[in-house]
């Protein structure tokens, strides 16, 4: 995962989604020791601390660390990569929270400083294993991230693309390193592809073309709601709770488009939440 400077827009957008994050995450916390991995600007970490937990934070970006250190009230702040949690924290945690990070682990991989960095699902599996090592028995792992649509390979269509949308599509297609996500066909103002590929493009589009040098590199949706549970079970976790949500901001940002699948109006869920317990 790169440690390049994150633009202020990134922190602003992450901060504006705090209400959704807090609503989804806080009710499932177990304490007292909670670690927020990929804490960014620290809005969620601060909310965790404010709820009475002994909150610690981890992030790889130096500017995120500067923000986190400026918050005050956090137990520990460490700079590093997600799979390095056992190396950076000596005591086990009661809960590890990972919000909007596992897709970055997939997209950018583990620390480039390690002897054999890994990418993709190998990086996800390694990171889940390392999280388990850092949890007490019965401890919780809470993942909030993109969720792949059910029946992800079924076709979907987007009609009504604007000239700016079409320009963004060509830029996205040029930048994306993920063949499955580039399986899209543009005809006039209409775009067709799998539900998964369509959803990935639409959500990236909401960030704006100026963010594509970073955002188009990422694969946001790694698993369907059910499949994440199966994968985590293989790593020694039991599912406690899962849900998917569609954030209104995404719907509003894309309201000029007509999105259909199977001949019916369709809009993909924007986030999933998975609460696991260490077996």
Residue ranges and their predicted role:
Residues 43, 47-85:
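Class I SAM-dependent methyltransferase SAM/SAH-binding core
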Residues 115-137:
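A short glycine-rich, Lys/Arg-flanked "PGG" loop and its adjoining helix->strand segment in the class I
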Residues 97:
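A conserved beta-strand element that flanks and buttresses the S-adenosyl-L-methionine
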